[in-house]
């Protein structure tokens, strides 16, 4: 990877000024002291030396692998699952968090104190924010914690994570006067509980750049898209195996025009064993964007539509025939939708099927 970074930096005339990690830095939080020492000694420090940077230039967030599962209180866990069910209860928790619930990830504050030396401008139990001047452009880095609700159970946690709109808004307030707002968070938004996803989406798209991770499957790979005029970059697993998508990204921003590019780098195993362009998503393995073009009217329109969406869905659900005339209550459109049976057929097989139907 180091040689690949040097190659891209030379070819594209890029200077690396910051390094961001979006979680799953170690294998298990229960071994955090040993594993973090190994992570920094064998990966981070060589990377910093290669790029000429130091601990003032790295930013990171915890992922589900950082959770110390030995610290999870099963009774506190059962209680929090039954309580955090809507926007009001989630907001109340963030205003007065329970130490028993956060015990599984509390050690990560020590990791921040030991290994992140960037200028800190805000911190609480969940979030840390930093302010950095890069080539006369002021960047605000908000490191959000989406992993605090994880219990290390993997895919079954989808739809159960919580970021909390309060956490996002506190971070935005802390970096409100910077030129470029950058958000680091581990879980994609579709891993959040439904009520939290609605609230967080409305707030988080005030960031210019949103970096997240957690996606380890070939289906998702690396996703970059405009959402509310924010650029979202989701990176796959960084581990040299054939069964997962592996890669990283280099984000380049022109300090004068705020025009940017994201260079998508994918690891190719087998005979090559190297990083190269990811051509599966974008031509030439590069995504181009422009920051700073936020239309206040479009933002307001997005907020209005976003606010009425839950109420409209609830209202429309009441008109299901099964809700009106039947005895079974259908809670949502998702509950009523039946996935059609799909299959792969050649043109010859399809013609036989059509003939049988005729």
PLM regions and their residue ranges:
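Active-site environment of divalent metal-dependent phosphoester hydrolases
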Residues: 26-30, 60-75, 151-152, 187-195, ...
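Conserved beta-sheet core of the metallophosphoesterase superfamily
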Residues: 136, 190-262
